[in-house]
Amino acid sequence: MEEDFQKHIRSLITENVLIVVEGVKDKNALNSFGITNIITLNSPLFSVVEHVAEKTKECGVLTDLDKEGKKLYAKLSSDLQRHGVKINNKFRNFL
């Protein structure tokens, strides 16, 4: 399991996948693993979606895995895809 986790982390780093997270603590946790291409949801959702769509054509969305986090993930993923951004779920599915 730990080896798989490290493999996924290395993949995110080498592919330089943009990751969208809910807050600063999430960002800091990913930073501690060497992941730096991160955006936090610190502005209105539509603004984040537009910013991501301008910056990349593929990103990962790592929201909390509770009920609210799953609802946020669904909304964010849907909006991003409507703006032409492919959602990379490899790491989220691993978790």
Give the location of each predicted region.
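TOPRIM fold recognition
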Residues: 24-33, 38, 43-95
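Short glycine-rich phosphate-binding loop at a beta-alpha junction
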Residues: 18-19, 60
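Phosphate-handling DNA/RNA-contact segment within nucleic-acid enzymes
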Residues: 1-18, 24-28, 32, 50-51
